[in-house]
Structures are given as structure tokens and as C-alpha cells.
Curated annotation (Swiss-Prot):
This is Large ribosomal subunit protein uL24. Part of the 50S ribosomal subunit. CDD domains: KOW_RPL26. The keyword Kinase does not apply. It comes from Rhizobium etli (strain ATCC 51251 / DSM 11541 / JCM 21823 / NBRC 15573 / CFN 42). PANTHER family: MITOCHONDRIAL RIBOSOMAL PROTEIN L24 (PTHR12903). One of its GO terms (cellular component) is ribonucleoprotein complex. It holds the Pfam family ribosomal_L24.
Length: 102
């Protein structure tokens, strides 16, 4: 079970976008990376294809999972733990102890 999943609201802990929040769009567990909406936006030079024009586009680049943390109810970053509730393994916010919906 992953600590950070698609749809989670996260905050950047390091890098040029430190402190900014966004929603996880994609998680790549094999590379330990995630794509976060509106964070780590880079410019890509797009080659022309039959469907797309050439030009410079803005795109979210993946960030390492160690540089992001889930946002707790009070808006501050929290670590994630696991607990068994009613026979199911669920994610729990270490800061508040609340179950993270997922």
C-alpha cells in the first residue's frame, strides 16, 4: 500500500516550489516519483506532429516522493502511518491521528 496516492493533496517540502500545494495527478512507485498539478512546471520544446503544432509548452515534471508530504486537516504537512480498522489497512495522519480518506 502506498503512502501517497493519486488525488491526495500534498505540499512541497523542498525545491523551487517549496511550500506550494497541489493535487497528485500520477504516482510512479518504481521511480519513487509523483506528478503534482501546478508544481514543478517546466517548459518543453514540442516537435510538430500530425495532431499537434510545434512550440514551447508548460508541463508538470515528476518530483521525488521524499520532497512532498500529505496536507493534514489544519493545512500543515504530515507523515503517513498505517493502522488496521475493522480488518482493513488504512492510512493514518501521524500529526492528528485521523484516518486519511482514499
Amino acid at each position: 500500500m502506498q503512502k501517497i496516492r493519486k488525488g491526495d493533496k500534498v505540499v512541497m517540502l523542498a525545491g523551487k516550489d517549496k511550500g506550494r500545494t497541489g493535487e497528485v495527478v500520477q504516482v510512479m512507485p518504481k521511480e519513487d516519483r509523483a506528478v503534482v498539478r501546478g508544481v514543478n512546471v517546466v517548459k518543453r520544446h514540442q516537435r510538430q506532429t500530425q495532431t499537434q503544432e510545434a512550440g514551447i509548452i508548460n508541463k508538470e515534471a515528476p518530483v521525488h516522493l521524499s520532497n512532498i508530504a500529505i496536507v493534514d486537516k489544519d493545512g500543515k504537512p504530515t507523515r503517513v502511518g498505517f493502522k488496521v480498522v475493522d480488518g482493513k489497512k488504512v492510512r493514518v495522519a501521524k500529526r492528528s491521528g485521523e484516518v486519511i480518506d482514499g
